[in-house]
């Protein structure tokens, strides 16, 4: 279910681009000439501003828009102080065994996990099926490509124009990474909770999440990694080879072939 959302801008100089974006996403366009708290026709707006493309909730008490941002805030803090290859996500994909892995992040969302993997030297291909999220992600990658510290990292991130189900089986990846939408109950920061609330409200749960595992297993050369909240069932009721447990969630790892057999 996708709650009502339209593309909007307050900038006359961006109106033409915003209309084209709305058309490409099959969404209404709104030229915004009033504060978000007074907008009632749409639950959310995909705002095109000089800062980029962000999603904003409308109505009374509307918070600031959410953007894909790889250059500041929590994402940048993790890049600089996140623990490197000692992080659970690094161990889950196998970076403790081999470097420079090719990874397909088939449920990219805001691209945070993909960015972490790219920071650690992986070549990451990203899939995002929801049009407005993909537009935000593309915008965030574009803006980051001009940042002196981050440009080299995002150069290792490639946003695909297709979903995982449309990828040719001959296009293999060392690792396929899945993080399907699920009703998380973790103790995230207020900012992270706001972002996730947006996407759960707008996009809803991934109803076909179980079917993604089969596609992932066909495309992965060495392993499939599934990120799950604590207490969540196995994807497609398929027991993993092993698990890595964290404070608020876990990684289910499906090993197809040992990474030790990957030629250097």
Curated annotation (Swiss-Prot):
Q: Identify the EC number(s).
A: 2.1.1.242
User: Which UniProt keywords are given for this protein, alphabetically ordered?
Assistant: Cytoplasm, Methyltransferase, rRNA processing, S-adenosyl-L-methionine, Transferase
Q: What top-tier enzyme class does this entry carry?
A: transferase
Intracellular or extracellular location(s): Cytoplasm
Q: What GO terms are given for molecular function? A: rRNA (guanine-N2-)-methyltransferase activity
Reactions catalysed: guanosine(1516) in 16S rRNA + S-adenosyl-L-methionine = N(2)-methylguanosine(1516) in 16S rRNA + S-adenosyl-L-homocysteine + H(+)
Where would one find the signal peptide in this protein?
A: none
Q: Where does S-adenosyl-L-methionine bind?
A: 112-113, 128-129, 179
Against InterPro entries, the record matches this protein to:
16SrRNA_methylTrfase_J, SAM-dependent_MTases_sf
Looking up Pfam families in the UniProt record yields:
SAM_MT
- What SUPFAM superfamilies does this protein map onto? S-adenosyl-L-methionine-dependent methyltransferases
| Bilayer-crossing regions | none
Which GO CC terms are listed, alphabetically? cytoplasm
Explain the purpose of this protein: Specifically methylates the guanosine in position 1516 of 16S rRNA.
Family, according to the entry, reads as follows: Belongs to the methyltransferase superfamily. RsmJ family.
Q: What is this protein called?
A: Ribosomal RNA small subunit methyltransferase J
Source organism of the structure: Marinomonas sp. (strain MWYL1)
From the broadest rank down, the organism's phylogenetic lineage runs: Bacteria, Pseudomonadati, Pseudomonadota, Gammaproteobacteria, Oceanospirillales
């Amino acid at each position: 279910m996708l709650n009502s959302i339209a593309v909007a801008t307050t900038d006359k100089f961006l109106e033409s681009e915003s209309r084209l974006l709305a058309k490409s996403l099959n969404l209404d366009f709104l030229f915004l000439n009033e504060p978000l708290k007074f907008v009632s026709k749409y639950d959310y707006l995909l705002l095109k501003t000089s800062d980029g493309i962000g999603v904003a909730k409308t109505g009374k008490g509307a918070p600031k828009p959410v953007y894909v941002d790889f250059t500041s805030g929590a994402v940048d803090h993790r890049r600089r102080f996140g623990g490197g290859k000692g992080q659970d996500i690094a161990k889950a994909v196998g970076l403790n065994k081999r470097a420079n892995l090719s990874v397909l992040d088939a449920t990219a969302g805001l691209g945070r996990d993909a960015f972490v993997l790219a920071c650690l030297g992986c070549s990451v291909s990203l899939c995002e099926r929801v049009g407005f999220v993909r537009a935000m992600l593309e915008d965030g990658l574009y803006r980051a490509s001009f940042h002196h510290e981050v440009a080299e990292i995002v150069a290792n991130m490639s946003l695909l124009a297709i979903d995982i189900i449309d990828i040719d089986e001959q296009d293999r990846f060392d690792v396929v990474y899945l993080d399907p939408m699920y009703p998380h109950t973790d103790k995230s920061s207020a900012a992270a909770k706001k972002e996730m609330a947006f996407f759960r409200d707008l996009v809803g749960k991934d109803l076909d999440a179980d079917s993604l595992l089969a596609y992932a297993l066909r495309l992965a050369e060495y392993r499939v990694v599934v990120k799950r909240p604590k207490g969540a069932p196995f994807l497609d009721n398929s027991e993993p080879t092993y698990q890595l447990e964290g404070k608020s969630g876990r990684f289910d790892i499906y090993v197809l072939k040992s990474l030790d057999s990957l030629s250097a």
